[in-house]
């Protein structure tokens, strides 16, 4: 790999890291934390948190594949905190066919006894964190003919 390629790769890594930090802050905010609480948790100043959130890029304009690549570890951690497991992406993002305006299709194993209200709330939280429309389905929660197709293309996060 050439030095130019190494430089470009490093720039891409920086962009993914910036997006991941932003998504992590949005996740903390979605969980009800104040900027002051976030700052204390991270060991940074509240103005630093405020500045990062104020510089919040329009995540709607971020390529869905790049957004999932950056946000995957954050939303997986958020899901696990809430008892969800086996988080994966399917659909156009998994097939590398997503357009700029594509939604993100996620599949997850909900905790035992999760109500429909709680499941919809989790989907709404993911939309808030990622800044775009999310289609969230549960393993086994689709029509039998569709499950096989979705499972075949699901990429674990």
Predicted regions located by residue number:
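Catalytic core of pol beta-like nucleotidyltransferases
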Residues: 1-86, 95-99, 111-157
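Conserved histidines in hydrophobic membrane contexts and catalytic metal-binding motifs
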Residues: 89
């Amino acid at each position: 790999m050439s030095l130019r390629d190494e430089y470009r790769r490093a720039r891409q890594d920086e962009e993914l890291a910036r997006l991941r930090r932003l998504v992590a802050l949005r996740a903390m905010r979605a969980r009800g934390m104040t900027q002051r609480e976030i700052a204390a948790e991270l060991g940074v100043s509240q103005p630093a948190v405020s500045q990062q959130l104020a510089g919040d890029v329009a995540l709607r304009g971020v390529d869905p594949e790049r957004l999932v690549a950056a946000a995957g570890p954050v939303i997986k951690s958020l899901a696990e905190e809430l008892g969800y497991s086996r988080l994966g992406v399917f659909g156009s993002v998994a097939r590398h066919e997503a357009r700029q305006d594509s939604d993100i299709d996620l599949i997850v194993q909900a905790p035992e006894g999760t109500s429909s209200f709680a499941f919809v709330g989790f989907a709404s939280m993911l939309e808030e964190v990622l800044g775009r429309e999310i289609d969230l389905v549960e393993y086994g929660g689709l029509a039998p003919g569709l499950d096989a197709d979705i499972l075949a293309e699901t990429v674990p996060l």
